[in-house]
Amino acid sequence: MIKKKMIRYLPTIAIMTVLAVSCTEEIKFTGEKIDPKIVIYSLLQPDSVITVSVAKSHAIFEEKYVPKQITDAVVKLYRDGELIETLTYIEPEPQPEYYPVTPYSKYVSQGVKPVHGSTYRIEVEMAGMKKASGEAGLPGIIPVTGLDTTQDHQADGYLLKEAKVRFSDPAGNNNFYRMAARSTEGLYYGNKTVPWSPEVPVTIFESDRSYASDNDPVITPRKEDQDFFDMQINNTYHIFSDELISGKEYALTLEMNNRLPDTDYYEFSLFDFELQSITEDLYMYLRTTSAHMQSNDAFITEPVLVYTNIENGLGVVGAMSSSTVTLKIGEYPVAGVTYEHSSY
């Protein structure tokens, strides 16, 4: 079993500008040198081939750091202790010159997909560095057992919806979740004073609606006393444990406000609500990463401990299993209707 560690990340220090009379002096960093570590990121999902992103860490004060692809790493995949594959490096797709260079290098399995009941270990070797590794197994699927909705038609043509995603938390285990939501909407921009024209396409918009769960108590627990400095950490990734709902049935509430689709012109709205069952390691990593980012430049906060389950390295190997339910208003796709995707 890999020993789980807490790696201390120092947030960016707010440097106060000192006014000098006529000169400035460059001060070299003289702290203890920190050796680079291997960074590993991998999220195991059913029906998806195993993919690993690797990188090298670098000191925050390192001069002229330039990210580059690591093409010669050795990335080994084990299942239940048995080596089953050495993953293949995949070059990134060409990007415009003004795009930043990605610091992560992708290594992909040629066909291995994780299955429930097995533990997968990923080992990464790079020249001159300590071998790093992390492991995970797929958590059980927690099925969505129902979707309850209420709707309020607004005078301005918008529809206020409340959706309750129902599920039962298994008793006897510590379970961890993430609530994700996405919308796909089709809008017709033709003249609506005349009948629908097949020459006018329905424009499709897609967006992340996970924020709709922000007001649910398991996502944002209520506090009786507000922090004097209003420093409550937001739940960036919409994750939660079963601490408040252990062994119980629960209905998680999402609140949305969107335009009411005009089905006479083949407009539609689709809302996908995805209940993700995630590993404890992934939960801890997302939770502490969120806190780290939000306290990064806070003047009076302590440095945040960011969780990792990587031995001799940084990052996380996690896993998730999902159950999805869809709310549908209108029909999509419809034969004879032209659709185009919005670039915004």
Question: Positions of the model-derived regions?
Answer:
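C-terminal motif of bacterial Sec signal peptides marking the signal peptidase cleavage site
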Residues: 19-22
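A sequence/structural signal for flexible, mid-protein segments enriched
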Residues: 24-344
